[in-house]
Amino acid sequence: MAGFAGGGGRPTTAGVLPGDGSLVLGTDAPDQVAELFEVAEQLYLEAEQPVSPQGYTIAGAIIVPFDQAGPHPLRGYGLAARSLLAAREYQHQTDYLRQHYERELFPQYVGEAQVIDTPWGRRTTTVWGQGPAWELPYTDYVTFLVGDPPNVSDKFTVPFATVVDVVGILPVAGITPARYRANEWPAPETLATLKAHAIDLPSG
């Protein structure tokens, strides 16, 4: 693809490898990007051997994922593809880990990555509920469920990066895609700090 890099304001080649050996090519021109990602996403979802719905383009002399190619008016398509890819990869991992901990009789919650539509595009979120230890997928947001699972008294959503900074949770070694282990429910003062950073997301 590097041989098709644009220059002088010309559109740059964009390509996607959705799976089953298929390759979708186009450019990052505004009138082509939407269709490129829509076709690639459908092929990815239908593939027997899915690879990725993410587009790749040229940044300088390097082939990079579309969401990491720097400022672009249509970067949102790359972020949406990243969210879908993350959720699908975590889905397989979540199923495996839940079966593993159940088999080992280990009291461990395994958080699930979910895709949500926000006013600023498709993103990922997970839940951290009050109770035993959790392994949280690295999503865009975390929703805290306060109280026993049947009787949640409060819930609020915080950016994942803020949770890492405030609580200090760390990634679990040897797990890909990354998960962060939360051994204890946050103390009341920590929970209050987290809630102060809460944002509004669509419910559903």
What are these regions (language model features)?
Residues 13-17:
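Short beta-strand
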Residues 26-204:
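C-terminal structured domains
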